[in-house]
Amino acid sequence: MLKVNNLQVYYGGIHALRGVSIEVNQGEIVTIIGSNGAGKSTLLNAISGFLKYKEGEVLYHNTKLPLNPSKIVKLGISHIPEGRLIFANLSVRDNLLMGSYLRKDKVKIHEDLENTYTLFPRLKEREKQIAGTLSGGEQQMLAIGRGLMSSPEIILLDEPSLGLAPLLVKTVFDIIADIRKMGKTLLLVEQNAYKALSIADRAYVLEQGKITLEGSAKEISANPKIREAYLGSKK
């Protein structure tokens, strides 16, 4: 479904991604784990067209993606960035509708809005509330809901648990599981490696801009070096 081949990305003189290749198959949850500065967010930004890459290619259904974020959204790829980036001065409802700004199918947009409210009842309760007054957990729900409103096939989800209390982290990962049940495919970047690996089918480890390990989430979780580096265990 989504293939990244030998991606090379530079920030000025910094070689941020060094020949990264990954694959995401339809219906999967694939996670990228790694430390801060490893290049995880850079990878998602390159896939979604926000960063130009010097070499390599990104294929979606065997067709090379354009370096144009709006066109990529139209093709069925939604990027939910780190930090939520909601429209703080708009209402919850208007934030959600901003996610559908490239769509023309008004009836289906209304259906998707109601489906989003079903997935996030809290957003329905607060649909007229100004988004900037929501709690951190509610803002993360709003960011995910807005991403769903573009009617994507695949969702690129960057650090969804960042800054959330443990109980809300569990809620967010339960929501991710529910989204997969809706038939969506997810590429997940997440510093909470334990939670990410517990929900993913497959995983890649990204270190200093390079993929150093890949395999099933179960295999990665059992790797002693990964357990020590990312899961807080030396066993």
Predicted region positions:
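Glycine-rich phosphate-binding loops of nucleotide-dependent enzymes
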Residues: M1-K235
